[in-house]
Amino acid sequence: MTQIHSTALVDPKAELADDVTVGPFSIVGPNVRIGSGTRIGSHTTVEGHTTIGAGNRIGPYASVGGVPQDMKYANEPTQLVIGDRNTIREFTTIHTGTVQDRGVTSLGNDNWIMAYVHIAHDCSVGNHTVFSSNAQIAGHVEVGDWAILGGMSGVHQYVRIGAHAMLGGASALVQDVPPFVIAASDKNGNKATPHGINVEGLRRRGFDAGQIAALRQAYKLLYKSDLSFDDARAEITAMLGQVDATTAVPLQAFVEFLAATQRGIVR
């Protein structure tokens, strides 16, 4: 059965599954829906048009579904949608979307969101990501499945971080990180620069030697050759016809990401 602490304030219009837990001094607003087995910690606010799936752990002291920090926002009924089995730790803030974009901020399944993280309006976060403490992403950012953001990293609005990519701690990211790539600050400052393929992460997730070798070759063409961006992309695309179907899968994702970039890729 639902367990709501006597000091919590849950609006009668909120929709809570039978086994949701709401901790002391927490607030749940009228347009909130919370799925089975989700636990809301103490002193946590869940507001706005927010839908939360099953098996999540949120708080304490988190703020979920707050209005976007966008001066154009005019109280439109924009949304936040959170999937299943996410851990959202203390003092995290996640805001709803804006009508200037899709009107939805989304967080998938099985994500690990550590303390003091900020996920701004209109962001799209996939599945199995890790946001280390104090990682901050601005509005309209896209984060692919299995990506990792290091502690105290900052991401500029509209940037995309590809699947299985990794952003180092205390890094400032202003352009896209292709999938499977590590980007981190270096001795010259906090600006993120490319540091190779996330080989260890890919091995842990079951990528085979052929797939990793192909991605390393693609990285060399993109970052270590004298080719222009367009010529490197063409060479990587040509590789698709030279490898087997299994090896081509991550390579295809790499090519498609490059083709879709609007801000350019991290350099």
Curated annotation (Swiss-Prot):
PROSITE patterns: HEXAPEP_TRANSFERASES
Lipid metabolism recorded as keyword: yes
Subcellular location: Cytoplasm
InterPro entries per record: Acetyltransf_C, Acetyltransf_C_sf, Hexapep, Hexapep_transf_CS, Lipid_A_LpxA, Trimer_LpxA-like_sf
Matching Pfam families: Acetyltransf_11, Hexapep
Cytoplasm as UniProt keyword: yes
Annotated disulfide bonds: none
Task performed by this protein: Involved in the biosynthesis of lipid A, a phosphorylated glycolipid that anchors the lipopolysaccharide to the outer membrane of the cell.
Protein's name according to its UniProt entry: Acyl-[acyl-carrier-protein]--UDP-N-acetylglucosamine O-acyltransferase
Taxonomic source organism: Cupriavidus metallidurans (strain ATCC 43123 / DSM 2839 / NBRC 102507 / CH34) (Ralstonia metallidurans)
